[in-house]
A protein has these predicted regions:
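Bacterial N-terminal signal peptides
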Residues: 7-15
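Middle-to-C-terminal accessory/interaction subdomains
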Residues: 214, 220-222, 233, 293, ...
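Intrinsically disordered, low-complexity polar regions and short flexible loop motifs
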Residues: 35-37, 52, 77-136
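Cellulosome-associated attachment modules in secreted, modular CAZymes
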Residues: 138-208
Length: 644
């Protein structure tokens, strides 16, 4: 009945929809689907040079990107990549060079920052209409016209057909499913067909209202965060750092959160320093207090607790109580952590936190002006509110949440450093973050969990692990972790993750592995643990098997097959995950969004550069080129070389 209803809708739309001119999709780069049936041929000239020859005796609309031009002579001026062709945020990616060829052919050489293509057009047989040129690595995946599900530049009956196919169970990659959510309600249903029909008939899609967590972590926006701290409180923050660089103590200040012109001001909030090896003094050097003139500002991580000093409903931003403000330490590309968390969510790992970019200012009382700290990461804290927001998926938000770190959280030592968050500056391998008054019970549960990982025989472990966790979700999480090259993790370095047990029962619970801290990824590599190359390390032997959880799971053929399947899905072209072209399109979009705001008053990290951290052991890795040192190419080869 449902299928019949959808077919009736499609027939009605075809009856009323205007006819559309033919559009030939020529492809999305040297690996696109070129169409010989329409006289299109491509030759690989080597060294990254490709010649595209077109011989078509008809008018053709050329779909190469998202900008319109009717004259090749003004192509340089019109070809831009970004949210708005007239925006200063746009980035020129190509230099267009036109050269005369024999037989009235013209070669158009598109020289990008990282790639070079040569397209040859036979002008005797080809008539250009209004063209759209798509950057060879694909259009901006975050900027599309509502209803244009197939991304051909228009809303047409073909989009209705594709939407119906998806509703009937047809396959579609992540980006297509995002576009299929025409009404913006975060699911693809028959209501999207109704909205799509309205669009075809000249209607419009109302802008969805962002509320709560979606308001704060809205990836379409670039919010401003302004912190205001009195002189005494700022100097106290510096003194706390000098006494203990790992201080967890808060000072009092106020925050202004500005998004799309809407300002939220909250007084009496808590502000503290955060980070592990990245902890820094935000101004000056040891013993120095604030200098009003020639201030020596430094990038640092900050935590903001809106309810630290006043616990009421007014001390939230649409229900959000805490913010993590993270500078892009050792990430010249300004993209690694943003990419990783978005990839987790894109792959269906719902335990991944929300994150976005923001711009940060700090004002110290008495100063004439506030200091611009530049572009920061705006991260969702993993705490009680994180659990409550995902209560339905976890099954309960009243269990035990553990923060696991310090390179000593291998789940292999029941006598290890296990404690609870007692509001001191002490740091532990395992810190209980919730239900701290029940620490003794929580500790027994964690120790029993460790013992079962280590001591159960294989048959019992196989049965038990499926009872206490979603094995598919865990292996998908770890597949993303390995694919992005996260060497500073649980398996390799006993570090950087959270565990959540959704029940206080000692035996009847489900545990969830929560990924955390992904700045040392995407080619930032280090000789550590079991590996010295985060791009080429065998994904089946990623870490130290003394950290037994993942190693024991992968001993079983069926679990190992699931893990390999998830890895290969991530790097397969067409899935819109982390094959090179899909990854580069997203990275360029993010960088275009923030490019004009990088320069800042700390004088640090003032340019976007395509390179890993300077202290890494593989400085050759890049993200935006197409050569043999491209991290996405290297990682895909390493994954495709394995089998279950």
């Amino acid at each position: 009945m449902r299928k019949f209803f959808l077919l009736i809708i499609m027939a009605l739309v075809m009856a009323v929809a205007p006819s559309q001119a033919a559009i030939y999709m020529v492809g999305s780069g040297p690996f696109g689907n070129w169409d010989p049936a329409h006289g299109i041929e491509m030759t690989d000239e080597g060294n990254g040079i490709y010649t595209l020859t077109i011989n078509i005796g008809e008018t053709v609309w050329f779909v190469f990107a998202d900008k319109l031009t009717s004259d090749w002579n003004d192509f340089n001026a019109n070809h831009r990549y970004g949210p708005d062709g007239n925006s200063s945020q746009d980035v020129h990616l190509f230099e267009i060079v036109k050269t005369q060829k024999a037989n009235n052919n013209h070669a158009y050489k598109f020289q990008g920052a990282n790639e070079e293509y040569t397209f040859t057009f036979n002008l005797n047989d080809l008539t250009f209409k209004v063209e759209t040129f798509v950057e060879p690595l694909g259009p901006d995946p975050f900027d599309f016209t509502a209803g244009d599900i197939n991304a051909d530049g228009e809303v047409s009956i073909s989009d209705v057909s594709l939407l119906i196919d998806i509703l009937l169970g047809g396959s579609a990659n992540y980006d297509v499913r995002q576009r299929a959510d025409v009404n913006g309600d975060k699911e693809v249903t028959i209501a999207d067909i109704s909205q799509l029909i309205d669009l075809l008939l000249g209607g419009s899609v109302p802008e969805p209202v962002k509320e709560g967590y979606d308001y704060v972590w809205d990836d379409k926006a670039l919010p401003e965060v302004h912190l205001d701290v009195s002189l005494d409180e700022w100097n106290r923050l510096l003194t706390l750092y000098d006494a203990n660089s790992f201080t967890a103590q808060y000072v009092m200040g106020s925050i202004s959160f500005v998004k799309n012109g809407e300002v939220t001001v909250i007084d009496s909030v808590g502000i503290r320093l955060k980070g592990n090896t990245s902890r820094r003094r935000p101004e000056g050097w040891y013993g120095e207090m604030h200098h009003r003139d020639n201030t020596d500002w430094h990038h640092a991580h900050f935590g903001v607790n809106l309810r630290k000093f006043v616990d009421d409903d007014a001390h939230t931003i649409q229900g959000v109580r805490k913010l993590h403000l993270k500078w892009f330490k050792d990430d010249p590309a300004y993209v690694r952590e943003v990419f990783c968390y978005e990839l987790f969510r894109r792959a269906g790992v719902w335990t991944a936190i929300r994150d976005n970019y923001c711009r940060l200012w700090i004002h110290v009382g008495g100063d004439t002006n506030e200091a611009y700290y530049g572009v920061y990461g705006l991260l969702e804290p993993i705490d009680k509110r994180y659990l409550k927001d995902r209560k339905e998926r976890f099954g309960s938000n009243n269990g035990y949440l553990w923060k696991c770190r310090n390179g000593a959280a291998g789940l292999n030592n029941p006598n290890g450093d296990i404690w609870y968050d007692d509001d001191t500056d002490d740091r532990h391998a395992y810190t209980l973050e919730t239900q701290t008054e029940e620490f003794d019970s929580a500790r027994v549960q964690l120790v029993n969990f460790m013992n079962k990982i280590s001591s159960l025989n294989d048959n019992d472990f196989y049965t038990w692990i499926q009872q206490v966790t979603d094995v598919d979700l865990l292996l998908k999480t770890y597949a993303v972790n390995v694919a992005v090259g996260m060497w500073d993790d649980y398996w390799n370095n006993a570090n950087n993750y959270y565990l959540y047990f959704n029940s206080k029962d000692q035996n009847n619970y489900r545990f969830f592995f929560i990924p955390y801290d992904y700045d040392n990824t995407l080619g930032t590599s280090l000789r550590c643990g079991n590996q010295d190359d985060a791009g080429r390390q065998n994904p089946l032997h990623w870490g130290n098997d003394g950290n037994k959880l993942i190693a024991r799971i992968l001993k079983f053929d069926d679990f190992r097959a699931i893990y390999v399947k998830h890895l290969q899905f991530l790097v397969t072209q067409g899935n819109a995950m982390m094959d090179r072209q899909a990854a580069q399109a997203r990275i360029r979009s993010w960088q275009a969004k923030i490019a004009d705001y990088i320069d800042n008053e700390t004088g640090e990290d003032t340019a976007i550069e395509d390179k890993p951290a300077s202290w890494g052991n593989h400085s050759e890795y890049n993200l935006l080129k197409s050569n043999s040192d491209n991290f996405f190419n290297v990682k895909a080869a390493s994954i495709n070389a394995i089998s279950p």
